């Protein structure tokens, strides 16, 4: 076998490792929906009033506030609370029960808001409001897995060489 300089091989392997791990195409910033001031101030109070107390029947204030929010703050309510991961901490059956008892049909409300936004050339959300969490960042998970497998390959090559 030919003589190889172990320092040069180690430096080359380190450069390849850093190029694979630090590739900027694989890192994407997570985007969050933009919140307006009214949404930030109004919606959390409604959610706290309606969903943090384990009642058999929601209060009249809760239902009135929810109905008002579904008419004036549909985008905020759907995008940031009903369809977001922050809302997933609440029991799905409990939250659906509160919305049903308040006679708020959120499944159709969110879909109608999405359709209105697309008709105006606005929102391009691909989520639906069926009380399920839709993850649109699946590609990011695959890129992390690819990066980790590349790291493993480089580590194996280093161990084989030395």
Curated annotation (Swiss-Prot):
GO cellular component: plasma membrane; side of membrane
Pfam families: LTP_2 (PF14368)
Keyword Repeat: no
Membrane topology: Lipid-anchor; GPI-anchor
Entries under InterPro entries matching the protein: Bifun_inhib/LTP/seed_sf, Bifunc_inhib/LTP/seed_store
SUPFAM superfamilies cross-referenced by the UniProt entry: Bifunctional inhibitor/lipid-transfer protein/seed storage 2S albumin
Compartment(s) where it occurs, according to its Swiss-Prot or TrEMBL record: Cell membrane
Keyword vocabulary terms for this entry: Cell membrane, Disulfide bond, Glycoprotein, GPI-anchor, Lipoprotein, Membrane, Signal
Disulfide bonds: 39-78, 50-62, 63-102, 76-110
Predominant localisation class: membrane
Free-text function comment from the UniProt entry: Probable lipid transfer protein.
Assigned protein family: Belongs to the plant LTP family.
The protein, known as: Non-specific lipid transfer protein GPI-anchored 27
Species of provenance: Arabidopsis thaliana
């Amino acid at each position: 076998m030919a003589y190889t300089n172990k320092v040069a091989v180690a430096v080359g392997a380190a450069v390849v490792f850093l190029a694979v791990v630090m590739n900027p195409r694989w890192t994407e910033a997570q985007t969050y929906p933009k919140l307006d001031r009214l949404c930030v101030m109004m919606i959390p109070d409604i959610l706290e009033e309606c969903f943090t107390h384990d009642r058999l029947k929601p209060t009249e204030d809760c239902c009135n506030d929810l109905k008002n929010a579904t008419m004036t703050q549909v985008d905020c309510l759907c995008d940031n609370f009903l369809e977001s991961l922050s809302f997933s901490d609440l029991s799905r059956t409990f939250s659906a029960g509160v919305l049903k008892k308040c006679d708020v049909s959120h499944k159709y409300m969110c879909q109608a808001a999405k359709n209105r936004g697309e008709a105006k050339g606005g929102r391009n959300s691909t989520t639906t409001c069926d009380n399920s969490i839709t993850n649109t960042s699946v590609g990011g998970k695959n890129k992390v897995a690819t990066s980790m497998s590349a790291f493993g390959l480089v580590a194996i090559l280093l161990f084989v060489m030395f």
